[in-house]
């Protein structure tokens, strides 16, 4: 354990950090726009085409989740699970506009603010919130204001650091509020599966299970040298997190040089539908970030990793700057074609670089229908 005199620890213990996470964001926005969809299973993603469509689920309503449907599921499988669901295409322009409105509300409640995606953000309130009792009331005000102005719900986690507040926000979804005081952090974290710790993906979870580590408490109490031997530097970091120690500060704005997303398949696959569908979802996420930041790009990069862990990247630079999602899709699929039919894929990723802020006075060719 770090010494009590460590200034970072003292700062972390004094902090009250909020994590605000919109509930089933894309689907909730669609229901807001079309109230007749309320209480129906709504799935946002690719066209299912009678169960033979390509692509994956972007998000779905909580009613759809009752059928076992979840994000990143192949859209054809979602159709088989619930053929009567309402399937809608991704409308990133609509979601980006709502996101901007939500984030503006949250900034009004924050002394420090960090948006981390189109539908979630961290904030630290001002000095008027002096303890966790006041923080709970403050969180209710945030939730009420988002509901009043945007007509959608969010879940809020409150804790002494980013780690705890992030996990807490997912505890009572949808429309939830979970407050974890510093003295309750271990009681809150220890019963959880290790997969709830950020950074513990499927492969890391598998490694930990082979070590006999299934719950956060077991990770917290594991010998750090043993963890380091199995996981390298990440082992020490995971032990810290399992003990509720997170000294990461909120970063209000960083200079963005690139935007990328990657995803690892649950099982290595050579199924072109799964590969292209997952890539399509990653592209939509990249494009959402582009729109959020009002960026144009000039270079598209594809990353693939095969079952033997060999990794390759391919890039293509355009002659003009653009923000067109179809340019990303067309280029990425062309780059992907070089690798299809070789081996099983373990990971795919896509990114854009050579970014610049869009001048709103400009009119791009892609702005016209």
From Swiss-Prot:
Transmembrane segments: none annotated. InterPro entries: DNA/RNA_pol_sf (IPR043502), DNA_pol_Y-fam_lit_finger_sf (IPR036775), DNA_pol_Y-fam_little_finger (IPR017961), DNA_polymerase-Y (IPR050116), DNApol_IV (IPR022880), PolY_HhH_motif (IPR024728), Rev_trsase/Diguanyl_cyclase (IPR043128), UmuC (IPR001126). The keyword Metal-binding applies. Residues 17-201 form the UmuC domain. It catalyses: DNA(n) + a 2'-deoxyribonucleoside 5'-triphosphate = DNA(n+1) + diphosphate. Keywords: Cytoplasm, DNA damage, DNA repair, DNA replication, DNA-binding, DNA-directed DNA polymerase, Magnesium, Metal-binding, Mutator protein, Nucleotidyltransferase, Transferase. This is DNA polymerase IV 2. SUPFAM superfamilies: DNA/RNA polymerases, Lesion bypass DNA polymerase (Y-family), little finger domain. Monomer. The keyword DNA-binding applies. Its cofactor is Mg(2+). Its EC number is 2.7.7.7. Poorly processive, error-prone DNA polymerase involved in untargeted mutagenesis. Copies undamaged DNA at stalled replication forks, which arise in vivo from mismatched or misaligned primer ends. These misaligned primers can be extended by PolIV. Exhibits no 3'-5' exonuclease (proofreading) activity. May be involved in translesional synthesis. It is found in: Cytoplasm.
